[in-house]
Design a protein with these regions (language model features):
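Mature, function-bearing regions of proteins
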Residues: 1-270, 306
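Coiled-coil-like amphipathic alpha-helices with heptad-repeat character
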Residues: 22, 294-295
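Intrinsically disordered and other compositionally biased segments
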Residues: 268, 277-281
Length: 306
C-alpha cells in the first residue's frame, strides 16, 4: 500500500517590515502525516515512532489540546463545531517531528480533505514558547490548489508583535511542492511576512536519515532561532512587549525592565534546548552533545542563514 504521508525539505523565510526592517531564512524539514496512517508508519519505519521515543517521533500531546483524545478525533470535533463536514475524508498534519526527543512547532497545519480529495478546511495550530496553543479553523471556499484565508491574531507569540493584528494565509495544497505563506497586518499596514516553501520526498527511513543529517536538531535550532532573532530585534530598538496572558493585549516594558530582561533573552536560546524528555543511553548523550552545538548559535550573526 502506497503511503499518503510525505517528507518535505525546504526553508522558512521571515521578513519584518515595521517598526524596524529585519529578515532571516533557515533550512528545515517537515513531515506531512496522514493521521489515519500513524499506526502503519509506526510499524513500517525504523527511525520514526508514534507516541514513543525514536530518532524521530510524533507525540499526540505535542499537538491539539494535549489531552488523551486522538488528533483525528480532536480535528473532527473542531470541524464539526464550525459546521464543516468532510464526510470522513483524510486529515494530514504538517509539522516538524521531535528529533532525539525534542520538538517545537511555531505553527502546525492540518489539511482536512473531503473524501474526493478536495480540501475542506485548514486548521492552523499556533504554538508559543510559553507552552500555549491556539487553533484557527478556516473553511476552504475555493476549489483550486491555492487557498487564501484570513483571521484575527488570538495568541501572544512574540514580545515584538502586538495582539491587534490580522493574519492572511496563502497556502498551496500539498503536492510535489508546498507553500504556507503568512502576512501579519495592523492598522498601519503589513508588519510581517513569513513563508514556508518545501519540496516533497517519499517518507522512508533513508530520506528521514538524510534530512536528519542535513538539518540536525532542527526543532532545537528553531527554538534557538526564535530567541536569537528576538535578541537581534531588541538590539535594533524594537519595543519589547510584556505578555499579559494567552489572549490579553501586551503592554510595553519600562526601559529598566528591558535591561533586566536582557540576560534572560541571551540565556533563553541555550536554556530552551535542554528542556526535553531525557532519552536513555547513547541517544541521550548525543542530544546533550548536539545541544551544546546549538547553544552557541546565538553568538553567530549568520547562524540561521542558508
Amino acid at each position: 500500500m502506497s503511503l499518503k504521508s510525505s517528507l518535505y525539505v525546504g526553508s522558512v523565510f521571515h521578513c519584518r517590515l515595521a517598526p524596524k526592517p529585519h529578515r532571516f531564512r533557515y533550512r528545515l524539514f517537515w513531515l506531512l502525516l496522514d493521521l489515519g496512517e500513524l499506526p502503519s508508519l509506526d510499524r513500517r519505519l525504523k527511525v520514526f515512532s508514534h507516541n514513543r521515543h525514536n530518532l524521530f517521533s510524533l507525540f499526540d500531546r505535542d499537538h491539539g489540546d494535549g489531552g488523551a483524545s486522538t488528533l483525528r478525533a480532536q480535528a473532527d470535533w473542531l470541524l464539526e463545531a464550525q459546521g464543516i463536514d468532510t464526510g470522513g475524508g483524510p486529515i494530514r498534519l504538517l509539522c516538524m517531528p521531535r528529533t532525539l526527543g525534542y520538538g517545537f512547532n511555531p505553527i502546525s497545519v492540518y489539511f482536512c480533505h473531503h473524501l474526493d480529495g478536495a480540501l475542506a478546511a485548514l486548521i492552523y495550530e499556533v504554538h508559543n514558547t510559553f507552552g500555549e496553543r491556539h487553533r484557527h479553523v478556516l473553511a476552504v471556499a475555493n476549489k483550486g490548489r491555492a487557498v487564501r484565508q484570513a483571521c484575527a491574531k488570538s495568541l501572544f507569540v512574540s514580545p515584538f508583535l502586538p495582539m491587534g493584528l490580522r493574519y492572511d494565509f496563502h497556502v498551496s495544497s500539498p503536492g510535489e511542492t508546498l507553500t504556507v505563506a503568512i502576512r501579519a497586518s495592523g492598522p498601519d499596514g503589513v508588519v510581517l511576512r513569513a513563508a514556508l516553501t518545501a519540496q516533497r520526498r517519499d517518507l522512508t527511513d533513508a530520506n528521514l536519515l538524510k534530512a536528519g543529517f542535513a538539518f540536525p536538531v532542527e526543532a532545537m535550532k528553531t527554538t534557538a532561532a526564535i530567541h536569537w532573532e528576538a535578541l537581534r530585534l531588541w538590539l535594533k530598538g524594537v519595543a519589547y512587549l510584556r505578555r499579559e496572558g494567552a489572549l490579553g493585549a501586551p503592554s510595553p516594558l519600562h526601559p529598566a525592565e528591558m535591561l533586566r530582561d536582557r540576560e534572560n533573552v541571551l540565556v533563553a536560546a541555550s536554556a530552551e534546548i535542554h528542556h526535553h524528555e531525557m532519552l536513555p543511553g547513547p541517544l541521550g548523550r548525543e542530544l546533550d552533545h548536539l545541544g551544546e552545538r546549538v547553544g552557541g548559535l546565538e553568538r553567530r550573526d549568520d547562524a540561521f542563514e542558508p
